[in-house]
UniProtKB/Swiss-Prot annotation:
Keywords: Cytoplasm, FAD, Flavoprotein, NAD, tRNA processing
Reported cofactor(s): FAD
Positions with a binding annotation for FAD: 13-18
GO BP terms, alphabetized: tRNA methylation; tRNA wobble uridine modification
Residues the record lists as binding NAD(+): 274-288
Any single GO CC term annotated in Swiss-Prot or TrEMBL for this entry: cytosol
Gene Ontology MF terms in the entry: flavin adenine dinucleotide binding
InterPro entries in the cross-refs: FAD/NAD-bd_sf (IPR036188), GIDA_C_N (IPR049312), MnmG (IPR004416), MnmG-rel (IPR002218), MnmG-rel_CS (IPR020595), MnmG_C (IPR026904), MnmG_C_subdom (IPR047001), MnmG_C_subdom_sf (IPR044920)
UniProt-recorded name of the protein: tRNA uridine 5-carboxymethylaminomethyl modification enzyme MnmG
Main localization of the protein described in the UniProt heading: cytoplasm
Subunit structure and binding partners: Homodimer. Heterotetramer of two MnmE and two MnmG subunits.
PANTHER family named in the record: GLUCOSE INHIBITED DIVISION PROTEIN A, PROTEIN MTO1 HOMOLOG, MITOCHONDRIAL
Classification via Gene3D superfamilies: FAD/NAD(P)-binding domain (3.50.50.60), GidA associated domain, C-terminal subdomain (1.10.150.570), tRNA uridine 5-carboxymethylaminomethyl modification enzyme MnmG/GidA (1.10.10.1800)
């Protein structure tokens, strides 16, 4: 039957991409439907019980700055929080949290159920309704037809998913869930370019059978306790737990090598390429044969379970090898395995067939987000989901769509990498992928994106009010530091020397003093003038987050300004549009190879064209000349 209500946006899939997509579309004002095969698994953390990390934490902060759910859900579910790279510069500092799986799922579901304009329906989707070159809806496994102006597909690892344990395999989307075989077949019929990728997960351990006395404890950060959301605070966190560290050894490695002949990866059973930066333990032993041991992090799965996730031993080896492998690890000699590790192969679609909005080029109104685009990780999925859901809603409501630039957000880097370069292995975000990372820090994600989110309709009043107060307070304090001056008379040697290492000889602004490497904002604000008054101003000193933002903006002002100059130089050509119907055969002097690559990728801008492998700067110059001629010719015709 035809479902009696029509929708602006239909989101297929209830994982990290799907939930953010549905929430974003509904926040913008689109009538949104979320279709999931199981309401109980909305927001399920299918693999590791953690959020964030280098590059990934930056994406979570950006999702939060745009009104998304992941950061706040993590603050409500996080059982350990740490700042990675804390001793390094602010560009590469990143937040990471262990999360209670049940609490995280509960936090996400609560937001979905309480979001106005969002309907949830439990049914697996078997087919898409396509009329001409446009999607018009989705069909579920019982033949129920839902019509919508746009569809966001977030199928994760479910498309023709195949689970491997040793040389045994069976169909599945993840352990305990069926695959989306019919939908996978339907997408093949639409002739969208696709491939196979692989990911994996480790066996799970009963924590009661672990000997913690021989392990190294890894507590979270306590002073201060990190938070993920710009609206979050440490009081939201549940009870905190430590993680523990053990190591593989020579016996572990011998056990793994002895089982490689029955590994689906090394016997040719698995065709898909696995994630380079999250390799299986058998891959580590094979690729790093000279390494005597590898760290294994024992991560609690939650407050009300004894289940432990051994991060670092993802494997698809036969269970008897997994058994010996786990019991060879110090502290796990008597461990009980609750679930076997496995690998899963799944279909993905070449993201070069997407526009930068994440809409497919071939089928209007159809958006892809998450692992279906060849990425790996909850954070990458959530970021794509938010963007795809927002753009699906904007298109359905006849509004202009939006994509962040590479200099605006890690989300912009992620999408640009996907649609211009494609993937040959599961894509993971790192800070090293961003050429403007000094400007794309975790701490300023809201200052970069919340105003944009407000204009799009993604940011509610509460978030906007909190952001506005922060923005104004930081700006006022930075200005105060620039306009407040000290000199040898009102800032005497007995005050200056402990702070600066020597007395001052001339007049300086407080901003000048803060730019010195050894001077912190907190120390400067504790210093006193000759009359005994503090240098501190009102409203910022007692707020660690505001104080950090002020210090970074002042200390790195010169570097950030230089980076912004560089951005402006590149921006003109970066954003220059290429007509969708351009005839590359008419561009004189292009090589055959470049012509073919441009025809295949159909870049939307000069910037995208320049990042296609094999497209040279000389070819870009020829393309610019051709576009100039087209523009001149069209103006001449109009006259």
């Amino acid at each position: 039957m035809d479902y009696p209500r029509e929708f602006d946006v239909i989101v297929v899939g209830g994982g990290h991409a799907g939930t953010e997509a549905a929430l974003a579309a509904a926040r913008i004002g689109a009538k949104t439907l979320l279709l999931t095969h199981n309401i109980e698994t909305l927001g399920q953390m299918s693999c590791n019980p953690s959020i964030g990390g280098i590059g990934k934490g930056h994406l979570v902060k950006e999702v939060d700055a745009l009104g998304g759910a992941m950061a706040l859900a993590t603050d409500e579910a996080g059982i350990q929080f740490r700042i990675l790279n804390g001793s390094k510069g602010p560009a590469v500092r990143a937040t990471r949290a262990q999360a209670d799986r049940v609490l995280y799922r509960k936090a996400i579901r609560s937001r979905l159920e309480n979001q106005p304009g969002l309907w949830i329906f439990q049914q697996a989707v078997d087919d898409l309704m396509v009329e001409g070159d446009r999607v018009v809806g989705a069909v579920t496994q019982i033949g129920l037809k839902f019509r919508g102006r746009t569809v966001v597909l977030t199928a994760g690892t479910f498309l023709n998913g195949l689970i491997h344990v040793g040389l045994q395999n069976y169909s599945g989307g993840r352990a305990g869930d069926p695959p989306a075989t019919s939908l996978g077949q339907r997408l093949k019929e639409l002739q969208l370019p696709q491939g196979r990728l692989k990911t994996g997960t480790p066996p799970r351990i009963d924590g009661r059978t672990i000997d913690y006395s021989v392990l190294e404890e890894q507590p979270g950060d306590l002073d201060p306790v990190p938070v993920f959301s710009f609206l979050g605070n440490a009081a939201m966190h549940p009870r905190q737990l430590p993680c523990w560290i053990t190591h593989t050894n020579a016996r572990t490695h011998d056990i793994i090598r002895g089982g490689l002949d029955r590994s689906p990866m090394y016997s040719g059973v698995i065709e898909g390429v696995g994630p380079r930066y999250c390799p299986s333990i058998e891959d580590k032993i094979h690729r790093f044969a000279d390494k005597a041991s590898h760290q294994v992090f024992l991560e609690p799965e939650g407050l009300d379970t004894h289940e432990v996730y051994p991060n670092g031993v993802s494997t698809s080896l036969p269970f008897d090898v997994q058994w010996d492998l786990i019991h060879s690890l110090p502290g796990l000699e008597n461990a009980h395995i609750l679930r076997p590790g496995y690998a899963i192969e799944y279909d993905y679609f070449d993201p070069r067939a997407l526009k930068s909005t994440l809409e497919t080029k071939a089928i209007g109104g159809l958006y892809f987000a998450g692992q279906i685009n060849g990425t790996t990780g909850y954070e990458e999925a959530a970021a794509q989901g938010l963007l795809a859901g927002a753009n699906a809603a904007l298109q359905a409501l006849d509004r202009d769509t939006w994509t962040p630039r590479r200099d605006e957000a890690y989300l912009g880097v992620l999408v640009d990498d996907l649609v211009t370069r494609g993937v040959t292995e599961p894509y993971r975000m790192f800070t090293s992928r961003a050429e403007y990372r000094l400007s794309l820090r975790e701490d300023n994600a809201d200052l970069r994106l919340t105003e944009i989110g407000r204009k799009l309709g993604l940011v509610d009043d509460a978030r906007w009010d909190a952001f506005s107060r922060k923005r104004d307070a930081v700006a006022a304090e930075v200005e105060r530091l620039k306009s407040t001056w000290v000199n040898p008379r009102n800032f005497p040697a007995e005050t200056a020397e402990p702070l600066l290492g020597k007395a001052i000889e001339r007049e300086y602004s407080l901003s000048d003093l803060l730019k010195r490497p050894a001077v912190s904002y907190a120390a400067l604000m504790r210093a006193r003038n000759a009359d005994g008054s503090l240098l501190a101003g009102p409203g910022v000193t007692d707020d660690d987050i505001l104080a950090e933002q002020v210090e970074i903006q002042v200390k790195y002002a010169g570097y950030i300004a230089r980076q912004q100059d560089e951005v402006q130089k590149h921006l003109a050509h970066e954003q220059q549009r290429i007509p969708a119907d351009i005839d590359y055969d008419a561009v004189s002097s292009l090589s055959f190879e470049v012509r073919q690559k441009l025809k295949t990728h159909r870049p939307e801008t000069i910037g995208q064209a320049a990042r296609i492998s094999g497209v040279t700067p000389a070819a870009i110059s020829l393309l610019l000349i051709h576009l100039k001629r087209l523009h001149y010719g069209s103006r001449k015709q109009a006259a």
